[in-house]
């Protein structure tokens, strides 16, 4: 069973749209273009009988079937399709919090794993100070070269953040990583948090 939720309001709205198509057995197909990247977009399309793919997961709903694209399915974990009414009519919304999160495991290249932990664990904390960190490269001896930006650039606490936060977290998650190096120009203190 897929971990996507399609609310009753969304089901009713979609059933109404599908009925207007005058195609017996028509359903919807939910997929993500460029899943696991910053360009990911969650999509819903009509799916006539026979247009679904063998590897798709079928969700039998009250009035129609929703087909979930197999490649997109892990990225649709915790996704919610909803329909909210307002003065102007209503709007179908799709919230897919994992659409842009890359799927990694211990066999993934070290750069993918570093980027994954930067985006999912480290940057959310730095964002509270208006900052972020990105991977520039992985150099000899498995040293990650990083660049800070936003409120972290020029910040007086960046050395502590680098060693006690970023480096510690990355080495705990990626044992073959031996350390991190900062290549940020911290002389620009215009947006610095501290």
Curated annotation (Swiss-Prot):
Disulfide bonds: none
Subunit structure of this chain's protein: Homodimer.
Stated role: Involved in iron-sulfur cluster biogenesis. Binds a 4Fe-4S cluster, can transfer this cluster to apoproteins, and thereby intervenes in the maturation of Fe/S proteins. Could also act as a scaffold/chaperone for damaged Fe/S proteins.
InterPro entries to which the protein is assigned, alphabetical: Fe/S_biogenesis_protein_NfuA (IPR017726), FeS_biogenesis (IPR000361), FSCA_dom_sf (IPR034904), HesB-like_dom_sf (IPR035903), NIF_FeS_clus_asmbl_NifU_C (IPR001075)
Annotated organism of origin: Pseudomonas aeruginosa (strain ATCC 15692 / DSM 22644 / CIP 104116 / JCM 14847 / LMG 12228 / 1C / PRS 101 / PAO1)
Cofactor note: Binds 1 [4Fe-4S] cluster per subunit. The cluster is presumably bound at the interface of two monomers.
Keyword entries, A-Z: 4Fe-4S, Iron, Iron-sulfur, Metal-binding
Protein name, per record: Fe/S biogenesis protein NfuA
Recorded family membership: Belongs to the NfuA family.
Cofactor(s) named in the record: [4Fe-4S] cluster
Keyword Nucleotide-binding among UniProt keywords: no
GO molecular-function terms, A-Z: 4 iron, 4 sulfur cluster binding; iron ion binding
Binding locations of [4Fe-4S] cluster: 152, 155
One GO-annotated biological process of the protein: iron-sulfur cluster assembly
Recorded superkingdom: Bacteria
């Amino acid at each position: 069973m897929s971990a996507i939720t399609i609310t009753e309001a969304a089901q009713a709205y979609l059933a109404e749209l599908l009925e207007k198509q005058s195609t017996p057995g028509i359903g919807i197909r939910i997929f993500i273009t460029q899943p696991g990247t910053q360009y990911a977009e969650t999509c819903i399309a009509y799916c006539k009988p026979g247009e679904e793919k063998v590897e798709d997961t079928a969700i039998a709903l009250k009035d129609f079937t929703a087909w979930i694209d197999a490649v997109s399915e892990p990225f649709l974990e915790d996704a919610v399709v909803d329909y909210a009414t307002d003065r102007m009519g209503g709007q179908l919304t799709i919230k897919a919090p994992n659409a842009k999160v890359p799927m990694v495991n211990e066999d993934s290249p070290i750069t993918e794993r570093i980027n994954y932990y930067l985006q999912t664990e480290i940057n959310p904390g730095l964002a509270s100070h208006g900052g972020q960190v990105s991977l520039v490269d992985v150099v000899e001896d498995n040293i990650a070269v990083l660049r800070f930006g936003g409120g972290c650039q020029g910040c007086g606490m960046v050395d502590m953040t680098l060693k006690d936060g970023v480096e510690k977290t990355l080495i705990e998650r990626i044992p073959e990583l031996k350390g991190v190096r900062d290549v940020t120009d911290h002389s620009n203190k215009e947006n610095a948090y501290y």
